[in-house]
C-alpha cells in the first residue's frame, strides 16, 4: 500500500513510517501540510494519514484544499490526532469524507488495521 503520512511531529512520523515500511507498505513522510499537498498533487497514494494540529498549514487546511479540488472523496483519509475532538467534530470530519478518525497515541497494529 502506498501511504502518505503528514504530521509535524518527526518522532511520530519516524516510528510510524518505519513500522509501516517493515509491514510491507511504501510510506512517504511530510512534516508540513503544504509539502504534503505537493506530494498529493504529484503522486497517487492509497491512503493519507493526516494530523490536524500542525503549525502554519494545518490538517484542516489540507482537508479544505482536497475538498475544494474534488479530491477528498477520491482519497482514503485517516486522521491521526492528539487534539481533543468532540463527537460532533468527529461526525463532521466523517461527513466531509474522512474515512477514520484515530486518537494519538495508538498502537501501531491498530493504526495499520485502520488503513
Predicted regions and their residues:
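Alpha4 helix (beta4-alpha4-beta5 surface) of REC/receiver domains from two-component response regulators
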Residues: 61, 84-100, 110-113
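Acidic, metal-coordinating helix/loop segments flanking the phosphotransfer/catalytic sites
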Residues: 29-47
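Hydrophobic/aromatic residues positioned on beta-strands within the core alpha/beta folds
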Residues: 80-81
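Active-site residues of response regulator receiver
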Residues: 51
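A Lys-centered signature of the CheY-like receiver
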Residues: 104
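Acidic catalytic/metal-coordinating carboxylates
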Residues: 31-35, 58-64
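The feature encodes the CheY-like receiver
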Residues: 13, 55, 85
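Two-component/phosphorelay signaling modules centered on CheY-like receiver
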Residues: 10-28, 95-96
Amino acid at each position: 500500500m502506498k501511504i502518505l503520512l503528514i504530521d509535524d511531529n518527526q518522532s511520530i512520523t519516524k516510528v510510524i513510517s518505519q513500522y509501516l515500511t517493515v509491514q510491507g507498505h511504501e510510506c512517504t513522510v511530510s512534516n508540513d501540510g503544504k509539502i504534503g499537498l505537493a506530494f498529493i498533487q504529484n503522486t497517487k497514494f492509497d491512503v493519507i494519514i493526516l494530523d490536524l494540529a500542525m503549525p502554519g498549514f494545518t490538517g484542516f487546511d489540507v482537508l479544505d484544499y482536497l475538498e475544494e479540488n474534488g479530491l477528498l472523496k477520491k482519497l482514503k483519509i485517516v486522521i491521526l490526532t492528539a487534539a481533543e475532538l468532540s463527537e460532533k467534530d468527529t461526525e463532521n470530519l466523517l461527513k466531509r469524507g474522512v474515512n477514520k478518525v484515530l486518537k494519538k497515541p495508538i498502537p501501531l497494529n491498530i493504526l495499520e488495521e485502520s488503513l
